[in-house]
Amino acid sequence: AFDLSAFLAEMEVLYQRGARNFKFVDRTFNLKIAASLSILQFFLDRLTDGLFLHFEVVPDHLPDRLKALIAQFPPGVLQFEVGVQSFNVEVQQRISRRQDNAKTEVNLRWLLTQSNAHVHADLIFGLPGETLESFAAGFDRLYQLRPHEIQLGLLKRLRGAPIARHTADCGMVYDKIPPY
């Protein structure tokens, strides 16, 4: 956790020094709605040419209050990296990912049709239990939504990460050299 007012004060310092490109890499940005709204409002109040904001978001969590603020930004300011990862329910369960796929699609459609945000959606291949066929079906499902970009990422294992419990039963093989 962090002190939001102290954080915004530091953002103000950066903004006053001329920073206009901000990339937030908290993958749960939109789960803390009060903080999300404050951060977005901070930048909405300071709209200027060249302002660019990148946020990573959970795909199935876009409450109406957040949508209302997102819709106020003009084109070219917001970019959302939407971490879909997989549409395969069995894979989602295996990696302890709770994602409402129908809500994910609704939110992606909303971002693409009701906001001016640039939408970059992620899928990961190599997840435990994901087959070529299920990955292809997920890709097709995402492609039909027409995000501005689709990023296909290769699963990387971090030492000590819980995903290692699937290594043997899923026949997963990793490089011995980081990033594994």
Tell me what each language-model feature is.
Residues 1, 23, 156-158:
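N-terminal pre-triad scaffold of radical SAM enzymes
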Residues 3-121, 125-127:
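Conserved SAM/AdoMet-binding glycine-rich loop
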Residues 28, 43-47, 139-145, 172-174:
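Short, structured secondary-structure boundary patches
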Residues 33-34, 84, 89-95, 125-133, ...:
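Flexible glycine/acidic-rich beta-alpha junction loops that bind and position SAM and/or redox cofactors
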Residues 38-42, 70, 96-100, 134-139, ...:
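Short secondary-structure boundary/capping segments
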Residues 65-70, 128-146:
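Catalytic cores of alpha/beta
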Residues 72-81, 110, 135-141, 170-178:
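A broadly tuned preference for mixed-charge, low-complexity surface segments
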